C-alpha cells in the first residue's frame, strides 16, 4: 500500500515539475500599457449610461479605468490608423473625441489588425476589423 502511494506521489511531483515551464510560458502575454490614439464616444461614472451609449454605436466597446467607463469606437498606436474609422463615424453623424490615452493592449494583435485596416477600403470590412481590434486587442474591456 505504501509503495503505491509513493509511486503516485512521485508521478504527481514529476508531472508538476514538467508542467512548470509550460505554465510560465502561458502566463507571459504580449500585453503592454502605453499611450494610444482613441476615438472616444463618451466617458461615464455610471456603467449603465456607458452601456446605453455603447449600444447606440455598433462595434464600440466599454473600457474601464479605475472607476471611469470610456466608450471607445477606435484605437491605434498612430493617429493615422484611425482615419478610416473617423470617416465612417462622420458619415453616420456620430460625435466623437480623438485623444491620447494610456491603454493596456495586446501588442501582437494590434499590429496585425492595423495592417489589415490600412489595406482595405470596404466599409463592412473596416467595421468588422475595427470591432475585432477593440474586442481582442484592448484589455479591461467590459
Regions found by a protein language model. Give the residues of each.
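Acidic/polar low-complexity segments and flexible, solvent-exposed patches
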Residues: 1-142
